[in-house]
Regions:
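Selective transmembrane helix interface/packing segments
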Residues: 1-232
Length: 232
């Protein structure tokens, strides 16, 4: 009973969004997840500037440039294989979201609260991704063709296809949020039972390996939705 109460209290504490500071006389409250997201963005911005300095188009390339190009090419090849050539225009977005979610899930290693533990963050990510999916369909088929696609392959499936407009973002949102929170609950249960050694190893697993898996699943499903939206 004590273990259950302790884990429940820690879960409630983790789910609570603490206001770090306020703007405009307290009307706009900035919570911890937002601040951590800003830190992640700032780190990526600085890293991007530093890593892309002195890049060459021809001649002898540095090991740094070769490594960066290899990583980008691997990611581009992956998304291209899922979405096809018509989806290449959306690859930069997919790569950005993948790196951002991966970093959010990993920031617990450094003592920060993961922004993906906040439902409003996962809702925002899911909504922007689904809006991109619908935009891809409209861009490829036109507004009239996009509307007609809801009645394919037969008109009777129209209600189901319309329902997917709600189901898909909810699925993306709660899958990411639920897996991150689930990992947190498992870690707290293990820490309460075996407080030494094992929790450290599992923490690295959930913060690094599982964090990357969740980022992969999110962008993979989004790329599949885009592929479905742009296919003839």
């Amino acid at each position: 009973m004590l273990l259950k109460t302790d884990v429940a209290s820690k879960l409630i504490e983790e789910l609570n969004t603490e206001t770090v500071f306020s703007l405009f006389g307290g009307k706009l409250k900035i919570d911890e997840g937002t601040v951590v997201s800003w830190i992640i963005m700032a780190v990526f911005l600085i890293a991007g500037i530093l890593l892309t300095r002195g890049l060459k188009v021809e001649g002898k390339l540095s090991k740094r440039q070769l490594f960066i190009e290899m990583c980008v090419d691997k990611m581009r090849s992956f998304f291209h294989s899922v979405m096809g050539p018509d989806g290449d225009r959306y690859i930069p977005w997919m790569m950005t979201v993948a790196v951002y979610i991966g970093a959010c899930n990993m920031c617990g290693i450094f003592g920060f609260k993961s922004p993906t533990k906040e439902l409003n963050v996962t809702v925002g990510l899911a909504l922007t991704s689904i809006i991109l999916v619908q935009y891809a369909g409209i861009h490829k088929k036109g507004t009239k063709g996009w509307l007609k696609s809801f009645a394919k392959p037969v008109p009777i499936v129209l209600p189901i296809n319309l329902l997917e407009l709600v189901i898909k973002p909810m699925s993306l949102c709660f899958r990411l949020f639920g897996n991150i929170i689930g990992a947190f609950i498992i870690m707290k249960l293990i820490e309460a039972v075996v407080p030494v050694a094992i929790p450290v190893a599992l923490s690295l697993y959930f913060d690094i390996f599982d964090g990357f898996i969740q980022a992969y699943v999110f962008v993979f499903l989004t790329s599949l939705y885009i592929q479905e939206a742009i296919e003839d």
